[in-house]
């Protein structure tokens, strides 16, 4: 029986076991997906000796995605471009890895807001932390002419923009309001609006009527930003879909079956969020 896990610190709140457990049951596969907390001071040694840990592969979450990437014998193009890996597997005892965050983000948009990238001109990304890398990469892959990157610390946005090239334009937080006027899609990658954090307060009235607003946060499922966007009549994309879609390639790699992100899976995770009081802000 294949055994895989989610590796990070902490991982107690990870819903990945629920996601993969759903697919294992759905397809009648004898497999196990567990949580494995790896202390930061043990991470480098853990991934360096991954073949000895008893796992066929797994997912990596914060704060270990970069450490895991550095331990890889081979990495897929997305992982190489971003310098982080979130999906691992073994081939002949060698550790291989991929980054499925960017494809997961795009798949979520494709399913939830079809045609969102039909005429890709300007996208606005809020935040220059770890989550923003996959989002920036995704927008560039879909051919956006310009991706505005806003961060409270401008130097951080500038450093990230330098990594991705001239189509990514760093702006200060005070430039967000003006940028909303030209953005076709807005993606929040900050923790603002997350449970226990202050809301992301933006004036969405200046957005075009066909604009799409996305959030990588899924606790709460409907962030204040998404709630405001819905009230404005805009199409919205929550962060739960990204979590579900990014999980597909790993499951296919480990178990040989490409699973579907269906209503039953989403309902399962939403029910878990509801049980923990995490649906609303």
UniProtKB/Swiss-Prot annotation:
Q: Which GO terms describe its molecular function?
A: NADP binding; shikimate 3-dehydrogenase (NADP+) activity
Q: Name one Pfam family in it.
A: SDH_C
Tell me its EC number(s), please: 1.1.1.25
Extract the InterPro entries matched here: Aminoacid_DH-like_N_sf, NAD(P)-bd_dom_sf, SDH_C, Shikimate_DH, Shikimate_DH-bd_N, Shikimate_DH_fam, Shikm_DH/Glu-tRNA_Rdtase
Name the positions where NADP(+) binds: 127-131, 151-156, 216, 239
Gene Ontology cellular component annotations, sorted alphabetically: cytosol
GO BP field: amino acid biosynthetic process; aromatic amino acid family biosynthetic process; chorismate biosynthetic process; shikimate metabolic process
Pathway assignment reads: Metabolic intermediate biosynthesis; chorismate biosynthesis; chorismate from D-erythrose 4-phosphate and phosphoenolpyruvate: step 4/7
Please list the residues that make up the active site.
Answer: 65
Q: Which reaction does it catalyse?
A: shikimate + NADP(+) = 3-dehydroshikimate + NADPH + H(+)
Swiss-Prot/TrEMBL keywords = Amino-acid biosynthesis, Aromatic amino acid biosynthesis, NADP, Oxidoreductase
- Highest taxon above the source species: Bacteria
Q: Which family does it belong to?
A: Belongs to the shikimate dehydrogenase family.
According to its UniProt entry, what is the function of this protein? Involved in the biosynthesis of the chorismate, which leads to the biosynthesis of aromatic amino acids. Catalyzes the reversible NADPH linked reduction of 3-dehydroshikimate (DHSA) to yield shikimate (SA).
Q: How does it assemble?
A: Homodimer.
PANTHER family for this protein:
BIFUNCTIONAL 3-DEHYDROQUINATE DEHYDRATASE_SHIKIMATE DEHYDROGENASE, CHLOROPLASTIC, SHIKIMATE DEHYDROGENASE
Q: What is this protein called?
A: Shikimate dehydrogenase (NADP(+))
The organism of origin for this protein: Azorhizobium caulinodans (strain ATCC 43989 / DSM 5975 / JCM 20966 / LMG 6465 / NBRC 14845 / NCIMB 13405 / ORS 571)
């Amino acid at each position: 029986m294949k055994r895989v896990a989610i590796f990070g610190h902490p991982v107690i709140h990870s819903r990945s076991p629920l996601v993969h457990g759903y697919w294992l049951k759905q397809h009648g596969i004898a497999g196990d997906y567990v949580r494995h907390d790896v202390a930061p001071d043990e991470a480098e040694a853990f991934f360096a000796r991954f073949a000895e840990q008893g796992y066929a592969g797994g997912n990596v979450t914060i704060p270990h995605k970069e450490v895991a990437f550095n331990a890889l014998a081979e990495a897929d193009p997305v992982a190489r471009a971003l310098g982080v890996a979130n999906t691992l597997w073994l081939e002949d005892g060698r550790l291989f890895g991929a980054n499925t965050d960017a494809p997961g983000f795009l798949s979520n948009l494709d399913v939830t807001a079809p045609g969102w990238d039909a005429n890709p001109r300007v996208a606005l990304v809020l935040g220059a932390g770890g989550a923003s890398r996959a989002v920036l990469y995704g927008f560039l892959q879909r051919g956006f002419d310009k991706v505005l990157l806003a961060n409270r610390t401008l130097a951080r946005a500038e450093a990230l923009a330098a990594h991705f090239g001239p189509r990514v334009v760093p702006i200060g937080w005070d430039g967000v309001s003006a940028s909303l006027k030209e953005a076709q899609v807005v993606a929040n990658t900050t923790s603002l609006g997350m449970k226990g954090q202050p809301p992301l307060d933006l004036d969405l009235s200046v957005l075009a009527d066909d604009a799409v607003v996305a959030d990588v946060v899924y606790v709460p499922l409907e962030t204040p930003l998404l709630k405001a966007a819905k009230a404005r009549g805009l199409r919205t994309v929550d962060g739960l879909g990204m979590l579900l879609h990014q999980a597909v390639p790993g499951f296919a790699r480990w178990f040989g079956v490409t699973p579907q992100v269906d209503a039953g899976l989403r309902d399962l995770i939403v029910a878990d969020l509801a049980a923990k009081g995490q649906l609303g802000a």
